[in-house]
From Swiss-Prot:
Protein name (database record): 4-hydroxy-tetrahydrodipicolinate reductase
Enzyme Commission number(s) from the entry: 1.17.1.8
Major site of localization recorded for this protein: cytoplasm
Organism field: Leptospira borgpetersenii serovar Hardjo-bovis (strain JB197)
Keywords for this protein: Amino-acid biosynthesis, Cytoplasm, Diaminopimelate biosynthesis, Lysine biosynthesis, NAD, NADP, Oxidoreductase
Length: 269
């Protein structure tokens, strides 16, 4: 590994996203994998992270030593679980290392903890690191400003059958964009529908969640008017799209002042 490359510590390296990040880093010209952290009870402890990810051996074995991983890194990427967030933030603050948080399902208290931590370190937090999805966010905002007040709006979230949180973090972000842009509140949001329904409230925003098959991630925002329908859709074809965005975010953070950044800042949107 070249010392001129950014050293990236990966937390949660044995999962789907971790494997994708390891694969993309293996061919990166700017960054390299310095360590990959898994839980102390993981069956993957000591295994070569490259071989586990389906590429050639990279000499970076899975470890449970979070402190050492963070200490030796230029930036940390965390795709573990929301239960690990406090440990990640504590280690990053202690060693003054910036961190990309890709973990979804964070509680409101944890989101508040990110704001507090960002006073001391740089943090990129986004429910979706894909460049395309962040364009979806921007296009949704534009459409909401242009026609949202005169539209029935629905969000569709489709993911693989193994995904644990619902709605997805991306769907929640789309909801937040719509609520903020249109001046509405969570009282205007409805999750699915069943039974005998009253006439649709014109300010209502519906969210519909599918968990089936092996779908990586599809999201659509619908704007229905009496005359036309706009559908803004993003479909992930490969998890590498999230990995590329995450690594780009890590490279963005290195040397940057403390603060809480999103992917709009990373992409200059």
């Amino acid at each position: 590994m070249s010392d001129s490359k950014y050293q990236i510590a990966l937390i949660g390296g044995s999962g789907r996203m971790g494997r994708a990040i390891i694969t993309v880093l293996s061919s990166s010209s700017k960054s390299t994998l310095s360590s990959s952290v898994v839980s102390g009870g993981s069956v993957f402890l000591g295994m070569d992270s490259g071989l586990h990810s389906g590429i050639k051996q990279n000499g970076v074995n899975f470890s449970s030593d979070l402190e050492a991983a963070v200490r030796s890194a230029d930036c940390v990427i965390d795709f573990s679980t929301y239960q690990n967030l406090d440990f990640t933030l504590k280690a990053c603050i202690q060693h003054r290392k910036p961190v990309v948080i890709g973990t979804t399902g964070l509680t409101e208290l944890q989101k508040d903890a990110l704001k507090v931590a960002s006073k001391e370190i740089g943090i990129v937090y986004s429910p979706n690191m894909s460049i395309g999805v962040n364009l979806l966010f921007k296009l949704t905002e534009i459409a909401a400003k242009a026609m949202g007040e005169n539209s029935d709006i629905e969000i569709q979230d489709i993911h693989h059958r193994h995904k644990k949180d619902a709605p997805s973090g991306t769907a929640e972000k789309l909801k937040s964009i719509l609520l903020e842009t249109l001046g509405r509140t969570s009282k205007n949001v409805i999750h699915g529908r069943h039974g005998i329904l009253k006439e649709r409230d014109p300010r209502e925003i519906g969210i519909h969640t599918f968990r089936a098959g092996e779908v990586i991630g599809d999201h659509t925002v619908y704007f229905f008017t009496p005359e036309e329908r706009i559908e803004i859709t993003h479909r992930a074809q490969d998890r590498k799209t999230f990995a590329v965005g995450s690594i780009h975010a890590a490279e963005f953070l290195v040397g940057r002042k403390p603060g809480l950044y999103d992917m709009f800042a990373v992409l200059g949107l």
